[in-house]
């Protein structure tokens, strides 16, 4: 450590190096513990790096994926059932439904569940047919609307073609006028003087 002493006008406090040494020795021996830069008896707490807690991933909400699969499988089974019933038997009419209801009324045995199942199957088949007819009506309406859109688009395209043709004809007529004036200048040597009528404004 380097010590530097500045010479001041008032040097009455220390006159000799021996006094400086004695003063430093006394101050070093009689120093306070609070003044020590590196005290030995002070316990320094160990600084551990803060570790983030390992976040446990949240469990996703229990989704019923199996139910979707089951619904799809049920729909496939119902469609296959409808296809097989359509192939094997004609569509149930009103008379078939009346006969099945009459059979239910006449049958007094313990097997009451079987005729009800047959009636419900007939209703399901009938509702599937009504759904198919609704789908057919919707597709027919969509086809009609598409045809209307196509006719409108074709009308717009023909109008645009007519406009382009008119623009081409205008350009062609202006080109022919320029060619005729050029030919007149070549043959006669100078352009004809044409007097333009000036319109007078009435006040």
Curated annotation (Swiss-Prot):
Q: Answer whether the UniProt record assigns the keyword Phosphoprotein to this protein.
A: yes
Impact of altering residue 189 to R?
In strain: Dts57
Q: Where in the cell is it found?
A: Virion; Host cytoplasm
Amino acid composition bias (Basic and acidic residues), ranges on this chain: 25-36
Q: How is it modified after translation?
A: Phosphorylated at multiple sites. Phosphorylation is necessary for cleavage activity. Phosphorylated by the viral B1R and F10 kinases.
Q: Name one GO biological process term.
A: viral DNA genome replication
To which protein family does this belong? Belongs to the orthopoxvirus OPG110 family.
Put simply, this protein is called Late transcription elongation factor OPG110
**High-level lineage:** Viruses, Varidnaviria, Bamfordvirae, Nucleocytoviricota, Pokkesviricetes
């Amino acid at each position: 450590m380097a010590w530097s002493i500045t010479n001041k006008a008032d040097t009455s406090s220390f006159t000799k190096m021996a006094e400086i040494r004695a003063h430093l020795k006394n101050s070093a021996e009689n120093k306070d513990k609070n003044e020590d830069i590196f005290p030995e008896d002070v316990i320094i707490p160990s600084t551990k790096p803060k570790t983030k807690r390992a976040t446990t991933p949240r469990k996703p909400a229990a989704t019923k994926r199996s139910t979707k699969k089951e619904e799809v499988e049920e729909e496939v089974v119902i469609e296959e059932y409808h296809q097989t019933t359509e192939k094997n038997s004609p569509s149930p009419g009103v008379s078939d439904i009346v006969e099945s209801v009459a059979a239910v009324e006449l049958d007094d045995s313990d097997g009451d569940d079987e005729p009800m199942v047959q009636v419900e199957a007939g209703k399901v088949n009938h509702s599937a047919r009504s759904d198919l007819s609704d789908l057919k009506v919707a597709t027919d309406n969509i086809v009609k609307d598409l045809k209307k859109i196509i006719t409108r688009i074709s009308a717009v395209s023909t109008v645009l073609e007519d406009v382009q043709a008119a623009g081409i004809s205008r350009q062609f007529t202006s080109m022919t006028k320029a060619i005729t004036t050029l030919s007149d200048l070549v043959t006669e040597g100078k352009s004809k003087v044409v007097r333009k009528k000036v319109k007078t404004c009435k006040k």
